[in-house]
Amino acid sequence: MSRKPLIAGNWKMNLNHFEAIALVQKIAFSLPDKYFDKVDVTVIPPFTDIRSVQTLVDGDKLRLTYGAQDLSVYDSGAYTGEVSGAFLAKLGVTYVVVGHSERRQYHGEDDALVAAKAAAALKHGLTPIVCIGEALDIREAGDHVQYNVNSLRGSLAGLSAEQVGKVVIAYEPVWAIGTGRVASAADAQEVCAAIRAELAQIANADVAGSVRVLYGGSANAKNVGEIVAQEDVDGALVGGASLDGEQFAQMSAIAAGGPLL
């Protein structure tokens, strides 16, 4: 089944709203419209930047989309510091990242909470990018495939087959995030293929064939081509490289079959 690649730029806690506008303008200027027929491109800024990004995207009729880095499992109420999926939907958000390794590591999020957040995103018409990935000790022990399969199942628990068909999965080996170490294309394919096989068990073969599985972990313009060429890798969740508008545009073009012309 043909799956349109997705290049998603996770800005993490970087850039104020003025800087966000400048970066989106740079990406839009650097990536001609023709590429958007072959690749979906989204930026995922901090909450405080989303309204500014929305105004720019809508005003200039840009073809890229934008997302959020997290959401609450609650719709509203006395939950100080939380941001509801209902609020994000009103801002025109397309994607929302759930279960990023930094949320799991620094905020104690587990698979059950990730599954609840994925369900909350879907409830409000948002596409969750569900993140899973192993630490270095798990990989070195040779347990990385089973670990990710188990985490996938836990992070999608309670979702129907139809709902699973609406998610994006991001495989992000924790040992490769922000370290400059990159999983080889074969490493990425091994786990992403296992994820797809497990999706067939969780849902069905049609869902498994349609869900996009991304690689995340020090992806950049030099390595993204080989990674997305793998049969079961459908794009990248990009960290640091997404803060460079020209490089992010180049990565998007490569995923579309590039190069950037």
Swiss-Prot record:
<feature type="active site" description="Proton acceptor">
    <location>
        <position position="172"/>
    </location>
</feature>
<dbReference type="GO" id="GO:0019563">
    <property type="term" value="P:glycerol catabolic process"/>
</dbReference>
<dbReference type="GO" id="GO:0006094">
    <property type="term" value="P:gluconeogenesis"/>
</dbReference>
<dbReference type="Pfam" id="PF00121">
    <property type="entry name" value="TIM"/>
</dbReference>
<feature type="binding site">
    <location>
        <begin position="239"/>
        <end position="240"/>
    </location>
    <ligand>
        <name>substrate</name>
    </ligand>
</feature>
<comment type="similarity">
    <text>Belongs to the triosephosphate isomerase family.</text>
</comment>
<dbReference type="InterPro" id="IPR000652">
    <property type="entry name" value="Triosephosphate_isomerase"/>
</dbReference>
<dbReference type="InterPro" id="IPR020861">
    <property type="entry name" value="Triosephosphate_isomerase_AS"/>
</dbReference>
<comment type="function">
    <text>Involved in the gluconeogenesis. Catalyzes stereospecifically the conversion of dihydroxyacetone phosphate (DHAP) to D-glyceraldehyde-3-phosphate (G3P).</text>
</comment>
<comment type="subunit">
    <text>Homodimer.</text>
</comment>
<feature type="binding site">
    <location>
        <begin position="10"/>
        <end position="12"/>
    </location>
    <ligand>
        <name>substrate</name>
    </ligand>
</feature>
<keyword id="KW-0963">Cytoplasm</keyword>
<dbReference type="InterPro" id="IPR013785">
    <property type="entry name" value="Aldolase_TIM"/>
</dbReference>
<dbReference type="InterPro" id="IPR035990">
    <property type="entry name" value="TIM_sf"/>
</dbReference>
<keyword id="KW-0312">Gluconeogenesis</keyword>
<dbReference type="GO" id="GO:0046166">
    <property type="term" value="P:glyceraldehyde-3-phosphate biosynthetic process"/>
</dbReference>
<feature type="active site" description="Electrophile">
    <location>
        <position position="100"/>
    </location>
</feature>
<feature type="binding site">
    <location>
        <position position="218"/>
    </location>
    <ligand>
        <name>substrate</name>
    </ligand>
</feature>
<keyword id="KW-0413">Isomerase</keyword>
<comment type="pathway">
    <text>Carbohydrate degradation; glycolysis; D-glyceraldehyde 3-phosphate from glycerone phosphate: step 1/1.</text>
</comment>
<comment type="pathway">
    <text>Carbohydrate biosynthesis; gluconeogenesis.</text>
</comment>
<dbReference type="InterPro" id="IPR022896">
    <property type="entry name" value="TrioseP_Isoase_bac/euk"/>
</dbReference>
<dbReference type="GO" id="GO:0006096">
    <property type="term" value="P:glycolytic process"/>
</dbReference>
<protein>
    <recommendedName>
        <fullName>Triosephosphate isomerase</fullName>
        <ecNumber>5.3.1.1</ecNumber>
    </recommendedName>
</protein>
<dbReference type="GO" id="GO:0004807">
    <property type="term" value="F:triose-phosphate isomerase activity"/>
</dbReference>
<dbReference type="GO" id="GO:0005829">
    <property type="term" value="C:cytosol"/>
</dbReference>
<feature type="binding site">
    <location>
        <position position="178"/>
    </location>
    <ligand>
        <name>substrate</name>
    </ligand>
</feature>
<keyword id="KW-0324">Glycolysis</keyword>
